[in-house]
Amino acid sequence: MPQPAKVLLLYAHPESQDSVANRVLLKPAIQHNNVTVHDLYARYPDFFIDTPYEQALLREHDVIVFQHPLYTYSCPALLKEWLDRVLSRGFASGPGGNQLVGKYWRSVITTGEPESAYRYDALNRYPMSDVLRPFELTAAMCRMHWMPPIIVYWARRQSPQTLASHAKAYGEWLANPVSAGGY
């Protein structure tokens, strides 16, 4: 039987202790031998990112998952710093920047608003696909495969049963992340 793809789960939440939804989503991830959970805020409380170490982690994995809350239509500050430092020209893009070619990118996002808020005629004025476009473009710049994002809308208002259902589906996907279909 073939080995499952190696997954690097980059977790970026500056207030992880207060995020019930993200803690529930992380539970199945830590149970899989093919998944490396890498908590950026725990590792880099001072925001000084060890770029060579991070790039080595990326080389060792096939699927890169970016799990974080949606902050001001983007990601938390440390993840943005990580993207700018680690996905550098010559490593992930530009001349010689071929280290991530063919790997997979999947965003796993929690939001504080319902899905209905992400429409052209609604509160946020744009659908989530537009909000996440910079991440999709970054994946394309790195010549990675963009996978449909997993979004848990209105995360803090979801029932424990709904969050458990999301976590179960997420865990099943993590077990075999590049198979056809899935969560």
From Swiss-Prot:
It comes from the Bacteria. It is an enzyme of class 1 (oxidoreductase). Interacts with KefB. One of its GO terms (biological process) is positive regulation of potassium ion transmembrane transport. It comes from Salmonella paratyphi B (strain ATCC BAA-1250 / SPB7). GO terms for molecular function: electron transfer activity; FMN binding; NADH:ubiquinone reductase (non-electrogenic) activity; NADPH dehydrogenase (quinone) activity. Belongs to the NAD(P)H dehydrogenase (quinone) family. KefG subfamily. Its EC number is 1.6.5.2. Keywords: Cell inner membrane, Cell membrane, Membrane, NAD, Oxidoreductase. GO terms for cellular component: plasma membrane. The keyword Kinase does not apply. This is Glutathione-regulated potassium-efflux system ancillary protein KefG. It catalyses: a quinone + NADH + H(+) = a quinol + NAD(+); a quinone + NADPH + H(+) = a quinol + NADP(+). InterPro entries: Flavodoxin_fold (IPR003680), Flavoprotein-like_sf (IPR029039), K_H_efflux_KefG (IPR023947), KefG/KefF (IPR046980). It is a peripheral membrane protein. Regulatory subunit of a potassium efflux system that confers protection against electrophiles. Required for full activity of KefB. It holds the Pfam family Flavodoxin_2.
